Each structure stands twice: as C-alpha cells, then as structure tokens.
Amino acid sequence: MSLLSVRDLTVKFAMRDQSVTALNQISFDLERGERLGIVGESGAGKSITGFSLMNLLSKPGYISGGKIQFQGDDIVGMSEAKMRKIRGNRMAMIFQDPMVTLNPVLTIGQQMVETLKAHRKISKAEAEQIAVMKLRQVYIPSPEERLAQYPHELSGGMRQRIVIAIALLLDPELIIADEPTTALDVTIQADIMELLLELCQSSKVGLVLITHDLGVVSQMTDRTLVMYAGRIIEAGSTREIINDPQHPYTQGLINALPQQTAPGQRLKQIPGTMPTLNEVPKGCPFSPRCTFATDHCRSTSPDLVRHAHVDVACHEVNRLHAPVSEGQSA
C-alpha cells in the first residue's frame, strides 16, 4: 500500500456566477520514504494540491471529485475531528513563510509544548525535553534558550529551522513543504534544503516538495510532477525529466535555468503567461504559448500517457521530442 494515493483529484472555486476548476483530475502516488517534487509557475495549482492533501482548503475552494488516500484512509470528506488526528501528527506541512506557522505572541517553547500535548499524554517537562531534542536535530544552537524566545527575536533562517522542528515533533510519515525557502537568503536556502533532505533520508519520511525551482527539484527529489493550469502535464523520474524532458513546457522551464544560458547572454523565457482559472483555453492549456501547437492541440485536451520513460500530456510529443541540448524551447 502506498503512503499516499491521489486519484482524479478535482478542486473547484465557487465564484459569484460560476465555478472554476483549479485542479483537473490529477493522480499520483507517493511511497514510504519517497521524495516527490511538484513544480510549475505561479498559478499552476501546486499549493492548492498541498492544501488539498492536508484537507486545509478554505472557501470558496472545495474538492469536487476524486480521492486522497493516506495509508488507505480516504481523507476527502473526513470529519475535522478525525483529520486533526492525522494533520500535524502523521502528516505535517511546512509553509513558505515561517510566520504563518509561528504565533508571534507565544514563545517557541510554548508553541512546541502545546503541539505535543495536543496529540500525546505527556507532562510539560517531557514535552520540553522532546522540543529541545528536535531543535538540536535541526542544528539550532543553545536550544534550551530558544524555547524562551519569541519568533520576532530570531532570524528568518532560524525561524524556518524551528518550523521544520515543529513539523518533526510528532515523527510524521509525510511532510508537505510548500516553497519552504522562498522568503530566505540564497545561502540560507541551500542550508535549509540540505537539512530537509538529511532529515527525510535519515527518518524515512515521505516528502512532497512544492516549488517553482527545477534546480531544487533536481537535488531533492526522486520523482517529479510538472503542473500547468491545474493539470499534471509530465510525470516521472526526476533524473529523466531533467535530463530528457518530453513536454515543451518542461523543456522551456529547463531552458530558462541560468546554467542553460552562456555568460553575458539574456536568460531564455517561455513566451506568454499562465492563464487564470477562468481563462483556461479549450484543448491543451499550454497551446497558446507553445510553438508546436496545432489545431488539434487547440481543440482537444491531451491525456497523460506513457512516452519513452515518463508520462506526458502532449499530442505532438512524437514530432517535437529532442534533447534539451539542441536548444528546443517552448
């Protein structure tokens, strides 16, 4: 049994006179200890996927179809009381802004102790011992002193390490990390990612890493889902997707990486922008930006099917496939 199994997950947002589709029948599995990257531009549906997995969608968003099974239990429609026993305990989420997680008026120690006591029958002293141990695990110096501090007294990198420590408090089997380093300095980003990778490898925790950065995905994950306009358009081994992308959008993302451009040259870009939820075109959602698009692409939505070593949703994949090194871009 997979740790996490998602089938035909569809999420909609109720608007004044219509509902718009934010996730369109996405499916994937995550095995125990596996690290999965979800990548795409802003508006692709990455964060909505993460919030759906945690059953944290707020109105006007709602799951309109599909299943999310965590260790065999379907969490779609699960009562909040039952979900609380899973969320923060067996599943945990790391947000891109640590101040979303941390309460500014409580000390770090108060927040960690409250989290532990909400899920376990332990004393305050026992909870503080566990909190100190977890802070040491994420390489926070003088952890006993940090328990008495407030979030605003700590640096951004230190706050994010504490958020990771809180996520690990109850030894979860799955961590969902939503752009966990976006708000941090570049050098601190690398440290946090290295820490997260080390912790997942040592404790065999499953990881869903949501990011716009293919470079991060290449270093952190075993498999990758590429999302566009609420759909999965390419899925497979991270190594295969990075080295030999099949979808023109994925090719464009990789060609836009700084290391793909010679010094002094302009960075490559994918022309156009991601459509808004109420403007997703008929057919392939990427067709308005794709130089390979045909009338068939513009009229008929492609299914996600096996091609070579990955699953890809593209009518023209047989015609256009070429190694990234040949300069093919979307």
Task: Give residue ranges: language-model regions.
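P-loop NTP-binding/switch modules centered on Walker-like glycine-rich loops
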Residues: N55, L174-P180, L184-R266
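Conserved ABC ATPase "signature" region
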Residues: D74, E126-E145, I254
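Short catalytic/signature loops enriched in Gly
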Residues: P141-E145, A235-A330
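Conserved ABC ATPase signature
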Residues: Q149-L154, M158
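A short, proline-enriched helix->beta-strand linker immediately N-terminal to the Walker B motif
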Residues: L169-E173
